[in-house]
Amino acid sequence: MLDSKLLRTELDETAEKLARRGFKLDVETLRNLEEQRKSLQVKTEELQAQRNSRSKSIGQAKAKGDHEEADRIMADVANLGSELDEAKAALAELQQQIEDIALSVPNIPDDSVPLGKDENENVEVLRWGTPLAYDFEVKDHVDLGEMADGLDFASAVKISGSRFIVMKGQFARLHRALSQFMLDLHTEEHGYTEMYVPYLVNPDSLFGTGQLPKFGEDLFHTSPLTEQVSDVPLKKLSLIPTAEVPVTNMVRDTITDEADMPLKMTAHTPCFRSEAGSYGRDTRGLIRMHQFDKVELVQITKPEDSMAALEELTGHAEKVLQLLELPYRKVVLCTGDMGFGSRKTYDLEVWVPAQETYREISSCSNMWDFQARRMQARFRRKGEKKPELVHTLNGSGLAVGRTMVAILENFQQADGKIAIPQVLRKYMNGVEFIG
């Protein structure tokens, strides 16, 4: 959520910056609402002052024994109270209208973000590794997994439906090995604290990280909306679309000491997404699932440190790919392809041989103070009384299923077996090939 002053005193400049990412801010409506708000604010304050002044006169009239005057003043005070209540209600309604508009406004892109309309105008900044040239016909991960009876899409369809998977034997073990390897790397070498978090979260948490109110259709929600347990209404819960939600919300409504910053947290969780806008896309294989595992990286920093932290966090995700010896490229998203709450985002795209292209495997973003303002996540500098908003960052380190896709396809052999990357073998009890 943007600073409200940007939508009051810097409206035209803010609209211009938002236009860079293809968002049209309704300047005229906001300006009119703000003028009405100011007028009502003044009226409310005047009515409050009049009521307070007249209320004091009641005691003075009674002290003089003029009860008739006291009654008349009390009637005036009651009328002023009614007017004040009406003005306050109108002011609250106006403020809610302004807030509703503000909640639909995305973050402002950083000046370093390239201009562009969509993903075709993202800018490649690095390419690591060289895709192998195979002397045999390359198979995709679906064929490789089904040949080895390690990926069972048919059973998943029977149990749950499309966009789910059952993994078996060494394929399930490889999936587990990947997540263990990622967690060990991030906790032992990159300085993150491992977290175990709920997979069901409340609306306040989803609001804090920006999924609500705008992206509710992308989530899986529990039903009914509320239920009574011991006379206490429970809020509707939703399955997490990413561990970013529960992990980042650890700092909601808190004030962190400057000495404890930055906070660096990681969590391995399943993620659940409805893929509401992805009908017909990536219907084959593990690329786009309703349920998938991911190791998430979250950093909570001081404002002046967040851009350097984005480079660091992205580097931590890159290290996973490098140790797995998977060719990838790094792109900075253009203004038209950025996520709703992002100030700046890097995508890491891994080489997928069967598709002969790079596919996203990690997205690393600096959210600036956008989430922090919603969450009231703050820190206090040493010697200062007033707390400041933190900056929040998050990124995949990595998506486990897509990493598995990359390993199956990049490490396939002519006979259909899969070589296990060297760094994973200790997690596989020394197994060198599967399939």
From Swiss-Prot:
Positions of region (Disordered): 41-70
Reaction catalysed by this enzyme: tRNA(Ser) + L-serine + ATP = L-seryl-tRNA(Ser) + AMP + diphosphate + H(+); tRNA(Sec) + L-serine + ATP = L-seryl-tRNA(Sec) + AMP + diphosphate + H(+)
Binding positions (L-serine): T242, A243, E244, E296, S396
InterPro entries recorded: aa-tRNA-synt_IIb, aa-tRNA-synth_II, aa-tRNA-synth_II/BPL/LPL, Ser-tRNA-ligase_type_1, Ser-tRNA-synth_1_N, SerRS_1_N_sf, SerRS_core, tRNA-bd_arm
EC number(s) stated in the UniProt entry for this protein: 6.1.1.11
Quaternary structure and partners: Homodimer. The tRNA molecule binds across the dimer.
Protein name per its UniProtKB record: Serine--tRNA ligase
Species for this entry: Aliivibrio fischeri (strain ATCC 700601 / ES114) (Vibrio fischeri)
